[in-house]
Curated annotation (Swiss-Prot):
Keywords associated with the record: Behavior, Cell membrane, Cell projection, Cytoplasmic vesicle, Disulfide bond, G-protein coupled receptor, Membrane, Phosphoprotein, Receptor, Synapse, Transducer, Transmembrane, Transmembrane helix
Activity regulation text: G-protein coupled receptor activity is regulated by lipids: oleamide increases HTR2A-mediated activity.
Protein name, UniProt field: 5-hydroxytryptamine receptor 2A
Comment field on protein domains: The PDZ domain-binding motif is involved in the interaction with PATJ, CASK, APBA1, DLG1 and DLG4.
Species for this entry: Cavia porcellus
InterPro entries associated with the record: 5HT2A_rcpt, GPCR_Rhodpsn, GPCR_Rhodpsn_7TM
Pfam families named in the record: 7tm_1
Annotated transmembrane regions: 2-26, 47-70, 88-113, 178-203, 212-237
Extent of motif DRY motif: 27-29
Family: Belongs to the G-protein coupled receptor 1 family.
Stretches assigned to the Cytoplasmic side: 27-46, 114-177, 238-247
Entry GO MF terms: G protein-coupled serotonin receptor activity; neurotransmitter receptor activity
Amino acid sequence: KLCAIWIYLDVLFSTASIMHLCAISLDRYVAIQNPIHHSRFNSRTKAFLKIIAVWTISVGISMPVPVFGLQDDSKVFKEGSCLLADDNFVLIGSFVAFFIPLTIMVITYFLTIKSLQKEATLCVSDPGTRAKLSSFSFLPQSSLSSEKLFQRSIHRETGSYAGRRTMQSISNEQKACKVLGIVFFLFVVMWCPFFVTNIMAVICKESCNEDVIGALLNVFVWIGYLSSAVNPLVYTLFNKTYRSAFA
């Protein structure tokens, strides 16, 4: 019984960690594509609802574990250790909890970068904006924040203050994208070995050495766990706001 609970919590928290990254990727893309809507309806309540949605999906994905684990111990207990032994769940769970979110993250991240580059080009090519940005050319110009996109969609700001705000937002957005890019890269590097090996354990049962596969899974799963521990370090290392918050 304890094995079913242990594996359920393991799958739940790992899936929730992955789904949160996927939600962040989607949220950033929506903020860039539709800044007016996102800025108007972005609130603590909306953020809370997004978090609830992530946890609901995570619970839904992991719930089969206690359902079949409490009924049949052989599906969660093998050779004296707690081990998920249901091949169907391993395959389906790996795709739903990792490969599908990974695909969404990769696509939305590159679409976000593309949109930011496009908006930055439009911002710099605008004659009025170009004049205001000339004295701030030392700042990166490859991205644009959703906040400034929202303001540009409503009205044109004038004066050097607006220029500073625009370029500061561009710089902040670029830094944010870099941090997210690093987080996503570490996510892939640290979780991909486990899920690939997890699928191999099911597909090549006859030809693969079970002891080797089992040993690899034990190592790779801990590397995956470290992914969540590394994220706060990445945020604090590359973002002053997070450094101040954790100080």
